[in-house]
Amino acid sequence: MIYSGDVQRIEPAPVAGPAPLDVAHLILAGFDRHYALFRYSAQRAKSLFESGDWHGMQRLSRERIEYYDMRVRECATQLDSALRGSDARTADGSRANGSAALSEAQTAFWQAVKQEFVGLLADHRQPECAETFFNSVSCRILHRDYFHNDFLFVRPAIATDYLDSRIPSYRVYYPVAEGLHKSLIRMVADFGLAVPYADLPRDARLLARAAVRQLRGQLPRHAGPRLASDCQIQVLGSLFFRNTGAYIVGRLINQGTVYPFAVALRRNPAGQVCLDALLLGADDLSTLFSFTRAYFLVDMETPAAVVNFLASLLPRKPKAELYTMLGLQKQGKTLFYRDFLHHLTHSRDAFDIAPGIRGMVMCVFTLPSYPYVFKLIKDRIDKDGMDHATVRRKYQMVKLHDRVGRMADTWEYSQVALPRSRFAPRLLEELRRLVPSLIEENGDTVVIRHVYIERRMMPLNLYLRHASDPLLEVAVREYGDAIRQLATANIFPGDMLYKNFGVTRLGRVVFYDYDEIQRMTEMNFRAIPPAPNEEAELSSEPWYAVGPNDVFPEEFGRFLLGDPRVRQAFLRHHADLLAPQWWQACRARVAQGRIEEFFPYDTDRRLHPQAAPPPRTAA
């Protein structure tokens, strides 16, 4: 009871909210629940591979991508409820992001939460991922003015360089002591697949011959025995599952040289497992771990140990991409952002408009010294039926879909603050004109409210313009293969102009413009009906009705094959793509539920090149 003059008034006693340690425990419990489900997904993948349930594998891959955001929302809701009425919230009862400024007490509280969280990670096996989860939850509570290292893990607090699982993350075999053939048999058998092998001793012999053959070509003359006394085979302890394949990933150490390798496992039509291919060298593994493919399902107690191992095999590939390819996309985003901030600190060039033909949907810019592009959805889109929500749905569709090595993955960010001084004047002017709703200029900072970030590639139209005849031939064949493989995976690109495709470092053609993609099963591929008379044929307007999803492949040549060199190469390899019959047959196969395999390696890497598995059909 409070006395104020002669007036008595009753004030409620302050509600004691949770202590910072309680909040830290709540967030860590949310992460631990997420990671337990993440690991269970990888364990389920092993069962699905053993049973040959490829549709189940596809569903699992899609569902797992959404696990993280579900757990973050769940944890933020629990935290919001726990903080209701506490001093950690603003005076009006809203969460702390209701206004930009925290009180002195709130500032101290949230800084203490981070400090307590660090203490909880001392013996944790996934500390870097837990820090990222903490950031995700905190960003739903705090205003962006507090998105810095006092409140978030902008820099990591726990070192993971020498962190490993209770059971070491990789196993070691010594082929000189027990023989290469026996070592390979034991290496494969130790994964404990609950499904019979077609002929493991035979496959191990083929694998040994392929390995020795490739080693012989790489060893210098007079190098001594092919397998020296230091020879070791080191393999990660979990299989890497994706689509219809499983992969053993490791390294061979011989005569002081490290040889990265992967062994592909496949089920044959009889349901038995075969060793299908040996991938040897960084380029082969780079293709396997490409940003254009679906994420692996891998059971990892300590992801940092797995990533450190992979980084030794793929030194050109950033750890951000490795975490992403293991299905830990948010950790990949965190590392990418840290790398990006580090690069900004140690560079001076300016963000500028990306080279190439301007698109109708996206405003694209780049930093010349950094191998990525930044894509913002325009405020006004000059395409019928296209808006922000539609474009974002298309990009999410690609994220959830099997990209079959032909669609670039993207990182999606919001509330990205960049130094205004690093923007070229013409870029800043273009952003103000085309995407004013997505930028906020605040003093010396430009805040981008929503952006997609992709690997930068050479646009195919620019590549073809300057390519020699042999390189053009390869690129055009790759372009047609990309269209075929996308269609077989139930993706119709929509706009197939060359400017919407890029060429990777290894010469692979990849699609990267997603605003017009649709499922093949939604399309109607038609032949152009005969003209009723000569005037109709000469008219600029079609003489036949055209539905919203009608496609006439006979028209493709008019838009795509104006360059005689490109036309000749295309007709040599892909003339059937200019007729509706191929598209109709492909659509029918997809509608039947057939799952076709796209090997992330060339035929010459296969141990049984004559035994390509047939397409699978739904049960």
From Swiss-Prot:
Family membership: Belongs to the AceK family.
Coiled coil (residue ranges): none
EC id: 2.7.11.5, 3.1.3.-
GO biological process: glucose metabolic process; glyoxylate cycle; tricarboxylic acid cycle
Subcellular compartments: Cytoplasm
Transferase listed as a keyword: yes
Active site per UniProt: D409
One Pfam family it belongs to: AceK_regulatory
HAMAP family from the UniProt entry: AceK
Protein's name according to its UniProt entry: Isocitrate dehydrogenase kinase/phosphatase
Gene Ontology CC terms, in alphabetical order: cytoplasm
The keyword Disulfide bond is assigned to this record: no
Positions contributing to ATP binding: A354, P355, G356, I357, R358, G359, M360, K375
Gene Ontology molecular-function annotations: [isocitrate dehydrogenase (NADP+)] kinase activity; AMP binding; ATP binding; phosphoprotein phosphatase activity; protein serine/threonine kinase activity
UniProt KW keywords: ATP-binding, Cytoplasm, Glyoxylate bypass, Hydrolase, Kinase, Nucleotide-binding, Protein phosphatase, Serine/threonine-protein kinase, Transferase, Tricarboxylic acid cycle
InterPro entries noted in UniProt: AceK_kinase (IPR046855), AceK_regulatory (IPR046854), Isocitrate_DH_AceK (IPR010452)
Catalysed reaction equations from the record: L-seryl-[isocitrate dehydrogenase] + ATP = O-phospho-L-seryl-[isocitrate dehydrogenase] + ADP + H(+)
Biological function: Bifunctional enzyme which can phosphorylate or dephosphorylate isocitrate dehydrogenase (IDH) on a specific serine residue. This is a regulatory mechanism which enables bacteria to bypass the Krebs cycle via the glyoxylate shunt in response to the source of carbon. When bacteria are grown on glucose, IDH is fully active and unphosphorylated, but when grown on acetate or ethanol, the activity of IDH declines drastically concomitant with its phosphorylation.
